Design a protein with these regions (language model features):
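ATP-dependent carbohydrate kinase catalytic cores
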Residues: 13-122, 255-260
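Intrinsic disorder/low-complexity segments enriched in polar/small residues
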Residues: 8-10, 31, 347
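Short, flexible hinge/linker loops that cap or flank conserved catalytic cores
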Residues: 2-4, 62, 237
Length: 347
């Protein structure tokens, strides 16, 4: 199976390195002897044993014999939860950190340091861009406005505050009026920084107003994600039919979608179920194991039996927003030495 083959290729070097490191210990096993086999979605990974049932539930109510599907981490379950396992689909998770997963039709032309290669639960190749920072710095600025409102003696509804500030950002200039934000609570490997300092930068002649201020921080939340995905879409010419967004950035209806659509120049969909995340994703993989009577592919099973054609609410990018974000990201990349200097001189 392609998933098994790819996983073996990706892990063989690490296995050999591990075996070499533990060789002086004289263990009677190799790493491959004790690790479970890699299985694609839909394969039976075993059954819950009586001993296992007792460990999970000492009361004895949990019965043995439950079939077990192959496990997945956040990336795999996120793809399933957003119906993004088919080639030419993808998903973006945007919260405290962010990552995009684009399911490829073919391998990339060469390796890229900022792009990780993984697979869907059923074995398709996926290009992953992971960013350490997303909404944390943005949330810190929102909390500053919360403090100001409290100082005035005005009751604060956080949902209303987020909604008003996020939506006001859309009234700003498409290029944020020259304002730049680096949301680096921690370092960002994609931009080559091992450490980070949250930084807001402007020139005296930039258009400094609240709308542009909020817009630059929203742009910053997906700025690094854009840099990584520009490689896929502009250099590798990757094609996608649908990208689904999920996570806290999309909680204020329409705003995060529009910002992300401008960043990667692609329509973005958001589904009501996307917020369910990993637990729901692995439950769907369990359902695929036991309820796939028609022997469908995972993509077809999700499309027909789970989502039933529901692609969510889609927002397409405007030419003005795309051009503005492109200008913003050029200013952003040009200013990265300022961010790097901040990590050296601000402790």
């Amino acid at each position: 199976h392609p998933r098994v083959r790819r996983q073996r290729q990706m892990c063989i070097r690490d296995r050999a390195k591990f075996d070499k490191l533990v060789a002086p210990k004289g263990y009677p096993w190799k790493l491959t002897d004790i690790l479970p086999k890699v299985l694609p979605a839909g394969e039976n990974a075993g059954f819950l044993t009586p001993e296992g049932a007792k460990r999970l539930d000492v009361s004895g109510h949990l019965k043995a014999g439950v079939p077990v599907c192959p496990p997945e981490g956040d990336a795999g379950t996120g793809m399933v939860a957003t119906n993004a396992v088919k080639q030419r689909t993808g998903n973006v998770s945007a919260g405290t950190s962010s990552f995009s997963m684009i399911v490829l039709e073919k391998e990339l032309s060469k390796p890229y340091e900022m792009i990780d290669m993984v697979t869907t639960p059923d074995g398709s190749l996926v290009a992953m861009v992971h960013c350490n920072n997303c909404t944390s710095d943005l949330n810190a600025w929102i909390n500053l406005f919360k403090e100001y409102q409290e100082l005035l003696g005005i009751p604060v509804d956080m949902n209303e505050l987020y909604g008003k500030l996020y939506n006001h950002a859309l009234a700003g200039d498409a290029d944020c009026g020259g304002l730049i934000s680096y949301n680096y609570i921690s370092g960002e490997p994609v931009t080559g920084l091992a450490d980070g300092r949250p930084l807001f930068v402007r020139s005296a002649n930039d258009k400094f107003n609240l709308a542009n201020f909020m817009r630059t921080h929203l742009y910053a939340s997906v700025g690094v994600l854009k840099i990584g995905n520009d490689i896929l879409f502009n250099e590798e010419k990757i094609k996608v039919d649908r990208i689904t967004g999920h996570g806290g950035l999309f909680k204020t209806k329409g705003v995060g979608q529009r910002i992300l659509a401008a960043a990667i120049n692609s329509p973005i969909s958001v589904m009501e179920t996307a917020g369910e995340g990993g637990a729901w994703g692995i439950a769907l993989l369990g359902s695929y194991l036991v309820n796939n009577e028609k022997n469908q592919s995972l993509a077809d099973f999700l499309e027909d039996k789970v989502f039933a054609g529901d692609a969510g609410i889609e927002i397409s990018p405007t030419a003005e927003d795309v051009a503005g974000f492109n200008t913003y990201i050029e200013n952003y990349k040009a200013g990265l030495p300022v961010e790097e200097a901040a990590t050296r001189f601000k402790k």
